From Swiss-Prot:
Its cofactor is Mg(2+). Belongs to the helicase family. AddA subfamily. The heterodimer acts as both an ATP-dependent DNA helicase and an ATP-dependent, dual-direction single-stranded exonuclease. Recognizes the chi site generating a DNA molecule suitable for the initiation of homologous recombination. The AddA nuclease domain is required for chi fragment generation; this subunit has the helicase and 3' -> 5' nuclease activities. This is ATP-dependent helicase/nuclease subunit A.
Amino acid sequence: MVQTIPIKPADVSWTDDQWKAIYASGQDTLVSAAAGSGKTAVLINRMIEKVIATDNPINVDELLVVTFTNASAAEMRHRMSEALEKAIVENPTSSHLRRQLSLINKAQISTLHSFCLAIVKQYAYLLDIDPGFRIANEAEVALLRDDIVADVLEGAYDSEEETQVQAIYRLVDSFTSDRDDQAIETLISKLYDTSRVHAEPQRWLWSLPKAYELAEEVTIDDLELSHYVKLTVRHSLEEAFVLISEMRAITLQPDGPAPYAETAEIDFAMIQEGIRISQEGTWQELFDYFATVKWSTLKRVSKDALVDVELQELAKKKREAAKKIMNKMKETYFIRTPARLLEEIRLMAPIIGTLVELTTIFSEQFRLAKLERGIIDFSDLEHYALQILTVEVDGELQPSPVALDLKKRFKEVLVDEYQDTNMLQETILQLVKSGEEQDGNLFMVGDVKQSIYRFRLAEPKLFMRKYSEFLETPDATGMRIDLNANFRSRKEVLNVTNYIFAQIMGERVGEILYDDNASLKPAAPYDEKEVPVELVVMHPPQDEETVDEQEDKTDEASELEELKKSQYEARFIIDRIRQMMEDGTTVYDTKSMTERPLKYSDIVILMRSMTWSTDLVEEFKLAGIPLYAESSKGYFDALEVMIILNVLKVVDNPYQDIPLASVLRAPFVGLTENELAKIRLADSKVPFYDALRQFIRSEGQGVQTTTFEKLQRFMLAFENWRDLARRGSLSDLIWKIYLDTHYYEMVGAMPNGKQRQANLRILHDRALMYEQTAFRGLFRFLRFIDRMRTRGDDLGTAKSIGEKDDVVRLVTIHSSKGLEYPVVFVAGMGRPFNKMDFHHPYLFDQDFGLAVKAIDPENRITYTSLPFLALKEKKELEMRAEEMRVLYVAMTRAKERLILVGSVKNWEKTRDNWQDAQNIPSDAPLQEYLRARANSYLDWIGPAVARHGDFASQATTSYKELDSPSHWWIQPIDTRHYSYDIQAFNDEIQQHLTTQEDEALLSEIKARFHAQYTYQKSTRKRSKTSVSEIKRLENLQRQEEPEYYFATPAKRTSTSIAPRPTFLQDQQLTGTEIGTAVHTVMQHIPQFGFDTIEAVKGFVANLVAKQLLTEAEGKVVPIKKVYHFFHTEIGQRFKQARQIRREMPFTISRVDEDGDAQIVQGIIDCLFEDEYGNWVLLDYKTDRILPHFAKEPALTKEIMGRYAVQLRVYSEAIESILQIKVSEKVLYLFDNEQTVQA
């Protein structure tokens, strides 16, 4: 039942839609919350209001709150606790509120996996699993999966049924090479994963072959997938139609090729008819249409005709492009007859059946293997929970008694990030919610425009169905609420985002209509200054190479060009960052609500992937700008990791020549190339390891060389490692290798040493994690690492810069989701989308299952079957829709400045292609074919921006501008501005050096290379030092002190007056430690001292009790000497002082005798103002003074000579910092209870 929403008070800050989302109830509710609209705050406040409501409040454990991450769940739980505590303060007598606070830790606020885990733990007795199960880690699951799928294939090969074996071989021949059957293992594993997002995986699997078992009367139009091919054909026909339309327009120009006009009209009508058939006709009609397409010959243009030759050529070029598109469509889809296409589908049914059978066997054996080990994985959690929540009735799944109990328990089910759920998760949610959509208790929050996890099998169509069906007002279905007020970004960022996505995002291409309900509305409190969004297009010089030359490049050349793009874009970003920092750019601080200077940590660089991360990090390092890159790549390519992995490979099997050679060349063995060659020559016909042993035997019999000694040490350690590998743990072996080789210390001394050591620690930690699984052994671990590398599951190198430091951040767009940054660079906008999944001979889909290429096993020919073609078109449309959403996430991360950076090969050609969009009616979005063929973000943004008024400075044609409040700064930048060619620079220097005529330049260069640095002495000084260090250095220069002032008259000691004072001798603590203890006592002792020695002793004991002194220190404090201090003249003045400051730390800048500035730190023992207003500097000394010299007049001179520098610096610090005059500088010598005046 729909309930009335309370009236919003005038003094609340919620928008009307937010208020509605917080209080709406009585039916399922979908909140479509755009970026920056405060959806998390709305969700949390809805929970809070449900619990603290005065009318019909619910208990906090009657809410089921499902979040996407554990961090989100923890934040919600914390904010709920804070809200309850605040409510209790306002209503301290409420027993309900106090009870909620005690229930908060029992509340089901978690990820869906955690909720499923709770169900499985509680009801494990309903399943055939060990109640003491544990969640397996990814490494263990991966290893087990690899073993099981290999066993399944091995078992299939060994089958006694000939028909089954033949079916297996046909399957293998269809999808693998002659080398191995790894592709079949991958195919089985991926098909298994796809099946697991369905509530009934086995039923879904067995439906796949049926889709290929077509009845005779079936036509292609009966196949749902054929719609996607027709849509693609239509897009191509529309593109050809635009080209012919442009050709026709050219023929009608005054100086255009008029003789072409008749042909253009024929072509125009022909393609128009094709578009009609693609929309309304059958497949057979389309086939017949392409079979009859004929291109007539263009009429000859008379030489005497007044025709612009360039227009004539342009008309030809447009027509040829249209013909190319049409011919490609025919060759791709309409060469084979419809009957042939259907027959190819039927022929694939047995192969699909065999694959499904193997996947089913694998699924069961994998399940049993996990049961045997008492483990489950995350996918099992959801399926076991579903098993507990359902019972099968007449072949359909119905809620079980457990599900019915949960329906009663949970008064509301709230789901965050609903756009990222899949079909299985939706099924679980439906089983625990109450009612139907029109009277249910399911509250869903999300933004389908930010659904970017399809690769994890998320299904955004779930959100889109409800979005289109739920009404904005209560009716016979659920309620939809749109939150589009953006509290994050400046209006310039939002206007540009709206401008772009209104043109590119539609229902057929983009899966979402970006209308007024979806557009972002500015709501953040920024000032009115104009901050345009920047579009930067990097391009090579136009005269550097032709387009044809660019297209003819080899793969290696393209790779080098890609490297250049990353460098150029990095250098522009560095330059732009420097410019902003130097120009005093400010950003708005939401905490202080004021403008403040831009910091590095305000800046982020977003990229689709981290492929360029290494290049960007290197460029930023050279530029001196700190960059933090959270990369998941490059770990296994790190030199130190490769070397240790090679050591492990050789320990496992020494008969691996390349790893063994790598280990011998490593610094901890240290063989040269010549030494390796000598070993190889010992016996070139045997494996290298045998040659190595033979070399050692032969060398050992003669004069033992350095090479022999290196190898002997290595082989001794090597045999120990092999022994440990057989009987010990893997992690111990790795650490033993580190210790024996000292390699861990070696890499620490290399550049980026901390990072390299962290990489080695990660390898050790990975071994520890591996050992926690049911697997053991070095061989399996190495195989596991190899599989990780094959699958691309890199670990990412350790980082020496922390992400909380004041650094620029480089992150993927996916990692940035949910975050915000004042300044956002989106780099790599011109990089092509990743289409690697379309290169396989198979494709997966949650709706249509599996599509494979047609195989002719007899002729060994592969065809692109119609299901494969259709599913490829569907997946490409989905891929582009996902990329649009990724772009949306990237652009909406920016709070104040958004800078889009991309590279193109040829700016003039790119600009002309973008300008084609200027012919579109001004009230229409970009044509579907333009959006559907895009291969990069620039392919969407460029044509859209070309219709904007700010593009006029770049345009070569006139056009009608789109009406838009957005503001762009468009910058095509020649890469020559950022071409720092180090080799060319070196070549130029070399040329100058070898030019005999320029002797003056040569002399100047030589003089500079041999120049002596003027301030060489200053380089040996510390820029920051202590008073003690200054004192020590000055005393080292003093050579005049007489020998008899030292504690050992017969032997001169270093720089101290004596090794120890009398009261410090025969103690376990050092003199420094006991001197510190005395200073501690003097720091805390009362100003008026004590009347008795026992009182001083009690005071010291109290310091020990308070742990300000250790027991050992308390025992050696000279109690009597401390007592006597207060009975000396200086002690009496201390007792009568007006102010006292003790243990006063300071830091000052001072200039030394060479004129160099130094930062000096120190701690002043005591500073007091006596009863006459004089400031006295008092310093305590515990140096030992020999008795027969204690009263010598020379002692004063000696003591002050030693400590004058210290007292002078202390005095300078006091006068500089406190702005007071030091009247006296006094040393108090505890050893002989004497005062020495400076």
